[in-house]
Amino acid sequence: MIMYERNGKLFITFNGTMNDPADIILSKTDKINVSIGDKTISGNIPKVISSAEDFTTALTDSDTTSIVLENNISIADQIKIEKDLRIDLGGHIISLNNSTVDTPLRIDSGNVVLSNGTIDATFANETVVPVCCFGGTLELNNLTVYAKTSKESCVFCGWGGIVNIISGVYENLAKDKYFWAGGSPLVLNISNDNVGTINCFGGIFIGKDPALGDDRLGGTFVAEGYKSEKITYQGKKAFMVIKK
């Protein structure tokens, strides 16, 4: 079942996609809890996002707490999130390859869930970090995140932010060693002076082993009760986080 809001109406489809005719159309509401036959529908209603402009508008709309992409979008300017928000990429791609800033997708506060799609910075400037958390809590689930930088990482956290990685694939495609300290290109990184927290409860990491923690502060990015195992993923050396 898929629920989404478009043009002031709530659309519900039980077996199709957002491009198929809806089974039920209701007046717009931000939350729903109804029973129809043997089906119960409840929860926040995601707003459909078709462009970077729609994305920006959703961030300033206090009533919008859940969004879903209906196509690939490209982000050039910074998207700054400062509220509770669920972001479902719907299997689509957010491209950061035309980014004009180093932190194009940045969480500053709130509880944010980012899931079900791809964040691609493969051809961005090498100072671009695809996902940044500078405050609040960010959950990453069923994502593929690509960076290609010898200076930065796929995910960066600082200023008291917390990143919880549940699942997904995180790959730094850089061919050179890490610019600042040598070794494998970074996949995860935290600020040295304004520390954040990264907890890995799952995921596949192609680049530096998350068990080795930060390049300067040490520690580990693997959550308590979990471990990192060396694997081969699509012909590449990788590390997979699993329960002990």
Regions found by a protein language model. Give the residues of each.
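Acidic Gly/Asp/Thr-rich repetitive segments characteristic of extracellular carbohydrate-active
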Residues: 6, 45-70
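Generic recognition of long tandem-repeat/solenoid scaffolds
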Residues: 10-14, 43, 96, 236-244
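Surface-exposed, short loops/turns at beta-strand junctions within beta-sandwich domains
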Residues: 18-29
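Short, exposed coil/turn segments at beta-strand boundaries within extracellular/luminal domains
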Residues: 35-43
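Solvent-exposed loop/turn tips at the surfaces of repeat/solenoid architectures
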Residues: 72, 87-92, 99, 110, ...
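Extracellular beta-strand-rich solenoid/capping regions of secreted or surface-exposed proteins
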Residues: 74-86, 95-115, 121-138, 150-152, ...
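Leucine-rich solenoid repeat scaffolds
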Residues: 181-244
